[in-house]
């Protein structure tokens, strides 16, 4: 597989930066929304947090791009004052690793299975961190339905957003020559 081009790296960084800003806005909306809707709100929005590595990997489909996009988004989110601190970096690295694994399994094809696996792996990887950090490794029965919602969001919210954004980027010509440009 060829190395990433300068254009691919720059586009990934720009996407990561924009998504990092979105994450920051969502972080501050999350506080009052979770108070009103409970912990399920985070699980419903999980797919949005999977956006940077998944969009980057869908567009370019080269090893390392998913983690790079995730780290850029996390750094921008952190620099803009995320209330979650350094945990943002860890969560995004885990999401990026999940997407990298999923796309490697499907041999870097941008098919629906890549999104399904990304959503499942991303939910599991980040839940493992949450389980240790936030739940003191104490299993509680409410975690099962939350995990199901997280997985579904990781698959469907991410899939819909990535497809919409990729379609818009194709129309601009920004992704001309990228792997996604060859898709129908």
Go through each PLM region and give its residues.
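Generic transmembrane alpha-helix motif of multi-pass integral membrane proteins
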Residues: 46-61, 98-106
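Membrane-embedded alpha-helical hairpins and interfacial helices in multi-pass inner-membrane proteins
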Residues: 38, 108-184
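Interfacial aromatic-anchored transmembrane helix boundaries in multi-pass membrane proteins
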Residues: 31-34, 73-101, 130-134
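Hydrophobic alpha-helical transmembrane segments
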Residues: 9-14, 47, 51, 63-71, ...
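Short helix-perturbing small/polar motifs within transmembrane alpha-helices
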Residues: 11, 21, 90-130
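Aromatic-anchored segments of alpha-helical transmembrane domains
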Residues: 16-24, 71-80, 119-130
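Hydrophobic transmembrane alpha-helices
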Residues: 2-56
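Membrane-helix interfacial "entry" motifs
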Residues: 1-4, 8, 38, 42, ...
């Amino acid at each position: 597989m060829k190395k990433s081009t300068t254009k691919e790296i720059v586009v990934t960084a720009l996407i990561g930066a924009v998504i990092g800003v979105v994450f920051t806005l969502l972080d501050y909306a999350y506080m009052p929304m979770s108070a009103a809707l409970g912990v399920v709100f985070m699980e419903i929005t999980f797919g949005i947090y999977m956006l940077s590595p998944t969009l980057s990997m869908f567009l370019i489909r080269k090893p390392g791009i998913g983690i790079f996009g995730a780290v850029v988004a996390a750094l921008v989110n952190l620099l803009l004052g995320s209330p979650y601190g350094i945990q943002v970096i860890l969560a995004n690295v885990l999401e990026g690793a999940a997407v990298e694994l999923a796309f490697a399994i499907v041999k870097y094809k941008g098919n629906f299975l890549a999104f399904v696996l990304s959503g499942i792996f991303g939910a599991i990887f980040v839940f493992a961190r949450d389980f240790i950090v936030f739940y003191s490794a104490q299993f509680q029965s409410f975690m099962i339905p939350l995990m199901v919602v997280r997985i579904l969001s990781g698959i469907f919210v991410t899939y819909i957003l990535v497809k919409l954004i990729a379609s818009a980027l194709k129309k601009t010509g920004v992704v001309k020559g990228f792997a996604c440009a060859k898709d129908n």
